[in-house]
Amino acid sequence: MRHIEFTGSEIADFEDFLRDPRAVYDPAANNGIKIRSVHLPFLPFEEIDPASGNAAVGSRFLETQRGIVKAAASVGIEIAVVHPSAEPYSEEERPERLACVIKRLSELKKITDEYGIKLAVENLPRTCIGRDIREMTAILAAIDGLYACFDTNHSLKDDNVEFVRALGSRIIALHVSDYDFINERHRMPYDGKNDWKGIMNALKEAGYSGTWNYEVSTDGRSAAEFTENYARLLENA
């Protein structure tokens, strides 16, 4: 293990990091591990949803993420991963919500540019905005210099191999796990239905050279199990 992602779902998860970024970053660095990316918070939904039509929610989203981006930049973290929306959203409101996402991420991109960090938008499942190739490519096309974080257990509409090919070189981060195509499950690769050979080859075609970041329920697993799993993925690619 050489690279990890610092992650938190809720704003409260980042209190210590905001207070003293070094206290979080240095213990990893002192053990030869680089925190390469930070996963920006997405909860509470009603407070920081970038797809919201409420201007106050949009402002809170940007204010919250600015503080975390600034802290991340101060310790040399390179990438900020962001969820494009909360949920649920109906089919009828998706165009309006997508427009809000593009507006807010455009503003967030200015903030990450200010601090020298790359911004990567993550594909999401179910009714979230960014759930399929069409919405993800629309977001990326609208914001110059925005990148993608591809989650291998989120697509419930499009084939993952085709998804990777569609996002191509815009992918600079991964969240790796397996699932049953019914809902996200965060299982170890080969414990679900993903076509791992196809995904690995599509990532090669895209020129992906970033971190292979597992986002798996540990369930008491050892570090050796992840090492063995990654070796199997490489062997079968």
Language-model features: where?
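Short, solvent-exposed loop/turn segments at secondary-structure boundaries
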Residues: E15-L18, D49-A51, A55-A56, E91-R97, ...
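Catalytic-core regions built around general acid/base machinery
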Residues: D20-N31, V101-I111, F163-A166, G198-A202
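N-terminal pre-domain/capping segments
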Residues: M1-S74, D113, Y147, D159, ...
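Histidine-acidic metal/acid-base catalytic patches
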Residues: S106, G130-C149, S155-A237
